[in-house]
Amino acid sequence: RKVNIGMDEAHLVGLGRYLILNGVVDRSLLMCQHLERVLDIADKYGFHCQMWSDMFFKLMSADGQYDRDVEIPEETRVYLDRLKDRVTLVYWDYYQDSEEKYNRNFRNHHKISHDLAFAGGAWKWIGFTPHNHFSRLVAIEANKACRANDIKEVIVTGWGDNGGETAQFSILPSLQIWAELGYRNDLDRLSAHFQTNTGLSVEDFMQIDLANLLPDLPGNLSGINPNRYVFYQDVLCPILDRHMTPEQDKPHFAQAAKTLTDIKEKAGIYAYLFETQAQLNQILSSKVDVGRRIRKAYQEGDKESLQEIARQELSKLRSQIEHFHALFSHQWLKENKVFG
């Protein structure tokens, strides 16, 4: 009977209405007092609690960061010593590309408690397209650190930030990778097991990331999401053009659309994922340079080119987006209740 009580990212705890009514208090102590109250309720109903650990570090580090050394005030230490056996702290981290970075954070956690779990991430929260490649990179390093620190429980999160645009089943490679690491501690059988489970090779399935895999992006960067910023940018207000290189990005998206269309034909029950991504990449290929060409034609007074872009290219782009809307709607309703 486990329950996760959250309590993460409470950056303004003690600074709102509470501050007006009660004045300044040690915020880490306030967290402990509230935690004790919640644990008392959980105990009453026979639940063991887990909670995200980040706020203890953000409240007790000098600069409010998760990955810094902490100095625990004595009054807070008394509370923590009393509570630490009643709650499992979940160290969540979806970003680090080296084992040592995780190890450093585990060492900090051990200052508070040894009842720890770890939460890694299957990246599906940066737009319409997942990032299984980055998920794999960080999973391998996190798994090493979890084993080195004798962590017995690992959670893999797949958050739905900003509208849950990424398909639920698009992160199957990430889940299989974590399963292999968890049960075997290697990826030697990843391809065979993934083929058995899905009917598709993991190499093919990983191509679902293509809208995020621009040729010049280092593999260890997280949160870079051309699938979203190219899609949403206003063609008449191209404020993100500095992040685009049309001469390489346009053919990349065009080839990605073709690759994903080919994979769709052998993807079986997952074909809808690749059809949606193929259409998205077609849109990105059409759109990535059109704003620049509109501005260039406007500055040069080239009304003929402007008319051609408006009547042909933008009309085609609108049709592509309408088709994507239909595909995305089908994908959404296949995986979710209508409101998510």
Question: How would you name each of these model-derived features?
Answer:
Residues 2, 20-340:
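Substrate-binding groove of N-acetylhexosamine-processing glycoside hydrolases
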Residues 1-20:
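Active-site groove signature of glycoside hydrolases
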